[in-house]
Amino acid sequence: MSAAAVSIDRITPGLRPEGPAWGYQNWRRLLFLHWAVPVVALRRLVPRSFELDLHYGTAYVGVVPFVMEGVRPRLAPPATAMNFLETNVRTYVVKDGVPGVYFFSLEAASRLAVQVARLMFALPYHHASMRLEGGPESTRYRSRRSGSGALFNVHYSVGQALGPSLLGSLEHFLIERYWLFTEREGT
């Protein structure tokens, strides 16, 4: 763990930011896939304004497919909420002492969600054709990005519940993140 990492507050990031939320969303049927990657290679891909967040010296890249449910702006009635499939490719960064997520790519099965996220949040969203099959015990998830042919296909079975993540554990490092960071062109 780096000297800078010691000063990162890994407990209070779970507290809600001040002010009203921009909207509502629920994530369901998540799968977290992660790989350790060389820090030097990852550093070249992440903007310099972000510090790589390392778990005991190791950098991680993750692929996270899931179902996004009940997505709507704060003032919109629940009846307007959208549900769609999404996959994100991410790594973990720190900005001003706050641990968060940096997305390399996000795919969504909703063209509207892609357009709004790109415009309002400068996130690298892409439209994709996606399919989710199976039940709560076994799931197949497929995604093909529109216009590029990029394909993601995974089949997984649910194992035993892990329980709450423990501070300092890899699970806590990867999952207990409540901030996302991006850069807008020109800032």
Q: What are these regions, as identified by a protein language model?
A:
Residues S2-D9, M68-A76, V98, Y125, ...:
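N-terminal intrinsically disordered, cationic/polar leader segments
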Residues V6-I11, P78-Y92, L132-E137:
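Short, surface-exposed, charge-dense and proline/glycine-enriched linear segments
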Residues S2-R74:
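Hydrophobic, proline/glycine-rich low-complexity stretches
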